From Swiss-Prot:
The organism's taxonomic lineage, starting at the top: Eukaryota, Metazoa, Chordata, Craniata, Vertebrata
Tissue: Testis specific.
Species whose genome carries this gene: Homo sapiens
Sequence segments annotated as region (Disordered): 1-97, 546-567, 1063-1113, 1177-1225
InterPro entries: ARM-type_fold, Cohesin_Scc3/SA, HEAT_SCC3-SA, SCD, STAG
Record-given protein name: Cohesin subunit SA-3
PTM note: Phosphorylated.
Amino acid sequence: MSSPLQRAVGDTKRALSASSSSSASLPFDDRDSNHTSEGNGDSLLADEDTDFEDSLNRNVKKRAAKRPPKTTPVAKHPKKGSRVVHRHSRKQSEPPANDLFNAVKAAKSDMQSLVDEWLDSYKQDQDAGFLELVNFFIQSCGCKGIVTPEMFKKMSNSEIIQHLTEQFNEDSGDYPLIAPGPSWKKFQGSFCEFVRTLVCQCQYSLLYDGFPMDDLISLLTGLSDSQVRAFRHTSTLAAMKLMTSLVKVALQLSVHQDNNQRQYEAERNKGPGQRAPERLESLLEKRKELQEHQEEIEGMMNALFRGVFVHRYRDVLPEIRAICIEEIGCWMQSYSTSFLTDSYLKYIGWTLHDKHREVRLKCVKALKGLYGNRDLTTRLELFTSRFKDRMVSMVMDREYDVAVEAVRLLILILKNMEGVLTDADCESVYPVVYASHRGLASAAGEFLYWKLFYPECEIRMMGGREQRQSPGAQRTFFQLLLSFFVESELHDHAAYLVDSLWDCAGARLKDWEGLTSLLLEKDQNLGDVQESTLIEILVSSARQASEGHPPVGRVTGRKGLTSKERKTQADDRVKLTEHLIPLLPQLLAKFSADAEKVTPLLQLLSCFDLHIYCTGRLEKHLELFLQQLQEVVVKHAEPAVLEAGAHALYLLCNPEFTFFSRADFARSQLVDLLTDRFQQELEELLQSSFLDEDEVYNLAATLKRLSAFYNTHDLTRWELYEPCCQLLQKAVDTGEVPHQVILPALTLVYFSILWTLTHISKSDASQKQLSSLRDRMVAFCELCQSCLSDVDTEIQEQAFVLLSDLLLIFSPQMIVGGRDFLRPLVFFPEATLQSELASFLMDHVFIQPGDLGSGDSQEDHLQIERLHQRRRLLAGFCKLLLYGVLEMDAASDVFKHYNKFYNDYGDIIKETLTRARQIDRSHCSRILLLSLKQLYTELLQEHGPQGLNELPAFIEMRDLARRFALSFGPQQLQNRDLVVMLHKEGIQFSLSELPPAGSSNQPPNLAFLELLSEFSPRLFHQDKQLLLSYLEKCLQHVSQAPGHPWGPVTTYCHSLSPVENTAETSPQVLPSSKRRRVEGPAKPNREDVSSSQEESLQLNSIPPTPTLTSTAVKSRQPLWGLKEMEEEDGSELDFAQGQPVAGTERSRFLGPQYFQTPHNPSGPGLGNQLMRLSLMEEDEEEELEIQDESNEERQDTDMQASSYSSTSERGLDLLDSTELDIEDF
């Protein structure tokens, strides 16, 4: 008789075998049902709510529910005599092929000739010519349908658009403006040029003599209000370019009117005898004609502005919004008399808050064109007072190109509108000079220059050329630069400030004569901090001029320098070297006592053209420098100073230089001095059991100096290995050697071994040499192993780092590349050493992570440094694992801390896991299981089997198992055998220990099945059946079974039930049409769909959800929180990265649970029902969007956290009279 456990497993198996997945896919529809604009003013910004419309949301929300179903838009005011007739049969004659479209697409012929050719054909047959133009615009939208002469004569615009909408190709989301491929690359430019040329060629005749411009505008207006994105995008572009061309025509008419008025006044003011009445009459007739033309053009512009712009500037598609803003900026610049008013400026101001980068960028660029003209700034005062705060805040925009343009806009405001930017506004820009993005930092540097430096150090121009700056002006510049750097307390590195100012003030920063004169001046009034800053500015400027690239952390994005830049760089390098070679010894002599100042001065040598020491006959200055270098090395023991000194001497000790012998002699003299001191001090240490503090300090300082030079120079001939080993052996045996001495001694022995290996690798070494080196290396490893148990933490960590590096160097990798003769040097650590390394890792790396503060306090800096040191230790251990030095099973000690220490070491552990899987997929999977087993066993030993799955530690283990499952990625078929193997071995472990005979307790390891359930979403349907059978077979060996199923078994069986594999039962989470609208017009990517399925597969255990239904999804809501947690923590959802970022916020509102539509897969009208649903999305979702999007869409616009109050909260602004003008919308 089967037990209850076996019955539970059997029930699950039957449910699994009987399950079947069903899915429905929607036909693609490229229509945007919520494209936001209606001619009657009842529209609402569906996807781009901005703060200026908050006061209108409530009213629109009420109207939205009562709005009738959307129909194809019609012209608001049909022109008298327009073509409005009844519908007729769809059988119509086909017009000839549209050669106009093909010619514009090819973009090979002259556009003016093309337009003239079309105008000739239009004059011969106006109806056919205009029909060809209409079909050109239709074909430019990507529509395969055409307008026939019968349609043209008998149907209205709205009926034509409705007919074309029904014929629109829905198989692809591409249309000419966005289509990929070289043939469409230049189409948009040719299209815009055609519209411009058309108006330009018609402006003197056809534009006023019967050309049906009103019909064309009416057609474009109707198309711009279409639900089809291609119609809306293309027609909006055409309408806005048409408007721009008409604005230029209106401007010319305005000029002609002014000229006519002047001519009329001049003629009328003539005397009676000189006045010509015919001339006055002709001028009056010309004025009347110009006024009529002006009224016609203004009527056209008004129709385009009110019919297209006021609806499309807030369209759901960002490309359309960007077109509108770009063009209105052109109108304001070219025809400022009519368009540069607050009633038009408000649209740019409101759109500054747009969610998309491209739209904000167009806004800022449009404003740059306005503020760049000083004559126009007087009309911008009201706008500036209203939107200045927003423009200043855009300096911190999350998109760098927008932030760069925002800073440049503020520069124009600073130049052309005095007193507008307050000190607080400017102080919000100053920190940006230290930004990591060089373009942004350079723009902020230019702002800083014009605000602080230019007024005091104005460059006087004469004859268009700059005069040489006076010493007083340069001194003022450097004093202001020092004041800003020191008093602002924004940053500690002058290199970033110099780089930011380089493009605008490079000539001043390259005044090395002025810098050195300030530093060497005896009666200077510079403080210690100012001297250090000035030296850092000098070195940063020299490095920038000689190397030509920004400091670490800033990337220009440029691949290389131009020939002109390389020549300038070479000239600057020579100029710098010739000036500083005589002065560098003087600077070192003056500041040799200060380590902070002497270190950057020693680094100056890397900026020199050292050949000038020879060609310029400056050897005497070389001798002075070498003397000062020796004094600095003997005087200091700080690592930074010693490293800089050793590197400077290394640059001079190049055998290619003619002065090599002098530099080599100075090096030998210095090392001899240090070695003699070391031998004397070491002898005293070995003979005496006690040393005072001065003796310890002197010995440690000498060892540090030797260690710094041994790192850069080959000091093998001084034979420092043996005395250092004696010192370390005494430290290990007696423990009487101070730790200050042990640390540099360990480093010295390490460098000695590496330099010996370098010599042996370059030539065929004898067996004796190889054996000697191996003995030294093994002896040093034993010393380091002994130091791992030292009481001093610094010694332990130093020994671990050196030991890790040596084991890696002498690993089997050293014989790769034809160096098989080094095989005797290959070393494998013993098991005891491997165990000690792992134990060290547990004691020093995986300790309780501390919360880092703001980073400003000294304690926070120390904590960050300690974290970096721990990361270095972990990285060394992981490299030993991946290169086969340590047993791969030791990786379980690392992987089991993956989740707990994710914030500190997550990137390192993830990379180790990825590399380990590449080496051996099967073994890596077993290591993951081993990590879980070890954690489970530790928890079991600590707390016992009772209530184990309710402990917080067990919940953390489940999170770790979930993260392990996610690390398998989307290759479900490739990892199939691994996941099945992991489940089987996990089941074996859970039942490996059984309770005593007669006991009713569950096996102690049974709760491990709950951890295995996290891997169940990675299984295929067939594998779940096999695993259920395997579990049932294993349970038969359980002697005593309770009267009810054990909880872990029930949970595990439930994870193998059919409701878990949502990726198989519901291939799409979002309907096709919805996903298309969210993601944009691009074609659906099969990889994106696959990644979406995989994400659904592994993140939840939700029952299969039929498309467009609302089921029990909401009851499982907590599991969706897991996805957000994984994304915030940076989980391994690598396969989900291919999905578009845009629309992620809105996708929460577009899920199937929000549609209460009955789902009947077998119903005959499903396709039509879904089509109607996709066409009426706006009506169904408007309530949700009104309530939720207005607060969500603006959250990520800027990097800084800022919120914008609604109109009702902040009161009416200065533009309220226009903002609340509903008729304009």
